[in-house]
Amino acid sequence: MTELLKTWLTQGPAGQQLISFNHHDIVTGSLFATQVYHLHQRLQARPEKRWLLACDSSDLFAVGLCAALLSGKQIILPANTQPGTLSELTQEFDAIVSDRPLCEGKIWLELKKELSLPHSPWPQMAEGDGFGELLLFTSGSSGQPKAVRKRLQQLDAEVSVLEQTFAAHLPHCSVIATVSHQHIYGLLFKILWPLAASRPFLSDLVEYPETLSYYTALFPNLCLISSPAQLSRLPDAVEHERQLHTPSLIFSSGGPLSLEAAQGVKRCYGSLPIEVYGSTETGGIGYRRQQSSDTPWQAFAPMELSNDSDGALLLRSPYLEDNGQYRCEDKVRLLGEGQFCLEGRLDRIVKIEEKRLSLVQMETLLNAHPWVTQSHLVLLENPRVQLGAAVELSTAGKAQLEAEGKLSINNALKAHLLSQFERVTLPRRWRYPQQLPLNAQGKLLKNDILELFDHD
């Protein structure tokens, strides 16, 4: 297998390689190398090994990522920069590389574009030095943030396979994304793969349909990195925007894409998006273009698939540490020739707006509120995917409900959850039964809880 990413990181970009762009600026390989060199020097002078990296601008993030990898540092990527999230991770990092201060009491190296720096070459690693590694934090099944370590060789294996699989469809393409680079999907598809394959990427996040239309009109060859939540809204969003060009390729990952959404994208742009199935732990496992609801997935070339007695997917992959085996919490039906169908989750990790969410973790935080005795969260899928919260209130909570009403309770509990969770992941529907439904063994009756949400 080629070492596309390692080769690029060792040699650095060509001086005239276009690294990134936005509507008013470009970053060339020469400028990028200079920025990486000077941050690398600052990191090398620091004894701290574990550096939290967070930055909204993708070109500055890439500077921080490359400098830290070449310095042999461990790079901590939080799921988000909410105060509660960073507080939970405070023992996991020693210092911060960011465009803004995030935590008091931690060493902070500021990421900023400095055009006055003297021209400098790409940093060279000393013989015997190793590349740094990444530590990504996701929602573990226990409800606590789970650390997922990624060595360069694992990321390199995936970048190389992506290039081998899709390069023929990406002639002279630029890359734009509606997803964050702080998560594994955006990190790979928006930052690492484009860098290694010399494809320029948009440094800003595409947040509005008119921005998408602007860049599709500007570039005849464009690759769009997106997610189901955003693609499902695309047909309505671009209905009144004349499309001069269409993306050469559209990727979707981070959660299931409905058949309706896939067909909607085809109506907009003339081709189906390529869905990528995987996780932070596994990287990409398979891909498909959804012609019908039962279109099977095709495993990427190096994957070895099997399943256990529960139907859970067992995976062997070079993207895993030591090329080991991993048990996924997805039930699958294997079809042969690397094809498979997904048949649902076996745990309580869900995706809300492509944000990976532990229901256990959110319930634990809810239950810590003085107005709550016990809570249970359910995923509601009609009329759209959203979270429902069934909450048994404490005596104080019931008094508040009686005095101030349901809306007051809703808002207070949402504010409580915002200390650790992003707003888009919060429950949209709330129920306050006198007691949560239990069976004789004290187990929650899920169907009875779902019935609480049958009527508004």
Region locations from a protein language model:
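Conserved AMP-binding A3 loop
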Residues: I26-G29, E133-S160
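Gly/Ser/Thr-rich phosphate-binding loop
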Residues: A237-S293, E304-S306
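Conserved pre-ATP/AMP-binding loop-to-beta segment of ANL
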Residues: E3-Q16, L115, H119-F137, A168-V175
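Conserved AMP-binding/adenylate-forming core of the ANL superfamily
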Residues: K6-T7, A14-A45, K150-Q153
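AMP-binding/adenylate-forming catalytic core of the ANL superfamily
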Residues: K331-T425
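Conserved C-terminal "lid"/linker of ANL adenylate-forming enzymes
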Residues: V350, A390, L413-D456
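Conserved AMP-binding/adenylate-forming
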Residues: Q41-T81, C173-H181
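Conserved AMP-binding/adenylation subdomain of ANL enzymes
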Residues: A157-S174, Q182-C223
